[in-house]
Amino acid sequence: NLIIHKAVTVDEALDVWGHSKIGLNIMTWHKYGMTERIADICLSGAVCLTDASEYLRNNFNNNENIIMYDLSRLDELPGIINNVLSDDSFRKHTADAAYLLAKEKHTWKIRTMEFLRMIKGENNK
């Protein structure tokens, strides 16, 4: 079932994504980066369905740990959603891979450690 929620807080969104198979994201102002929403969707156990950004193309694998769509081809979105929802194995594999990647690279703890290394002038290893 498609559920379109009214506006929710960040905490409420985490609960919604935790009960969802897919979290739909639109990269409004972050065309070269990533938003917290993407990490939150991945960490919730849902498949993240988002338009692409340079950062996402370089740090995620489309159809492996994220599903990216093209805003100029929105007519393809219903088919993409149907494919994800009709193949439980693919959906679960994608969500699990996204969770592992987000847990390894996209938590606030990881980001804090990266910032501290930058401040100290260390490389990002």
Where are these regions (language model features)?
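Catalytic binding pocket for nucleotide-activated donors in carbohydrate/polymer assembly enzymes
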Residues: N1-N123
